[in-house]
Amino acid sequence: MGRNDEERLTADIIELARQYGRYGYRKIAALLRSTAGWVVNDKRVERIWRREGLKVPAKQPKRGRLWLNDGSCVRLRAEYPNHVWSYDFVEDRTHDGRKYRMLNVVDEFTHEALEIRISRRLKSADVIDVLSDLFILRGVPGHIRSDNGPEFVAKAVQEWIGAVGAKTAYILPGSPWENGFIESFNARLRDELLDGAIFYSLAEARIIVESWRRHYNTVRPHQSLGYKPPAPEVFIPVMGARSAPQPRPAAPTALAPKPILH
C-alpha cells in the first residue's frame, strides 16, 4: 500500500469513526470492506485507529444490561427466521419536552429490526395494527416474546395473536434479561441515535429513526453475525437515490380480522 493509499485509508477511517461514533475499529474495518471497497484487515485498521488516537466514547452507566454470555437466561431460542420475534416499547421526548413512544419489533434469529412504529401514544390497538402489517409482509412467526406490559397482555392482543396462528411468550415479571434480544436492540438504538439526537417534531423523529433502522439492517456490521448486517438483501442503500424494496416472503393467505377495541 503506497503513501497515497495509506492517507486515503486513514481519511476514510476517520470519517467513518466520526459518522458512527459508537463503532469500534472492527466494525469500521467491516464497513471499509463492505461499503468502501477496501481490501484491508482488522490489524491494519487497528494500527491506524490507535495512531490517530481514535476511541469509542465511554458508555454511560445507565446503559448497562444484565446478560449472560451463554444465553442461559433465554428459555425459548430462535432456530430459524420468523421463529421468534420480540417487541418492546421505548420512550423519548421531542425538543419541546413532549413524550413519544416507539414500538420496536425484532426477529431474534436474523437480528433484523422489522419495525419501529413511532407515535405520541401507542396502545394495544396499535400493537395489533403493527403486527397485522408485518404478518402480511413477512408471514406469521411461531412465537412473539414480550414483557408483561398492559399493551402486550391485553386480552384482545392475546386472542388475535392466537387466532392468526402465533404463540405469545411472556417473560417473568421483573426479568428484562429474559428478553435480551430486544433489550440489546433498544440499547443500541439509544446509544447510536437517540442519546445524540434532538428531534424538533414527531415527523423528523420518524424519518431519522427509519433511516437508522434501514442502516442497522443493511449496512451496520453485527459482531454476532460475523460483522455482517442482518438483512443486506431487504434494502439496497444507494447514495442519492431511493432504496428499492426487494422481494418479501410469501404473505399468509388470510389473517384474523382485527378486533374492535373500546
Where are these regions (language model features)?
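Basic, flexible linker segments flanking DNA-binding modules
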Residues: 1-84, 175, 229-240
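RNase H-like two-metal-ion nuclease catalytic core shared by retroviral integrases
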Residues: 2-4, 146-160, 168-191, 201-210, ...
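Mobile genetic element proteins and their domesticated derivatives, centered on retroelements
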Residues: 13, 28, 45, 49, ...
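Residue-level detection of the helix-turn-helix DNA-binding "recognition helix"
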Residues: 33, 50, 54, 162, ...
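Mobile-element integrase/transposase regions
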Residues: 38-106, 112, 125-130, 137-142, ...
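Hydrophobic beta-strand scaffold residues
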Residues: 56, 167-168
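C-terminal domain-tail junction helix/linker
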Residues: 164, 187-262
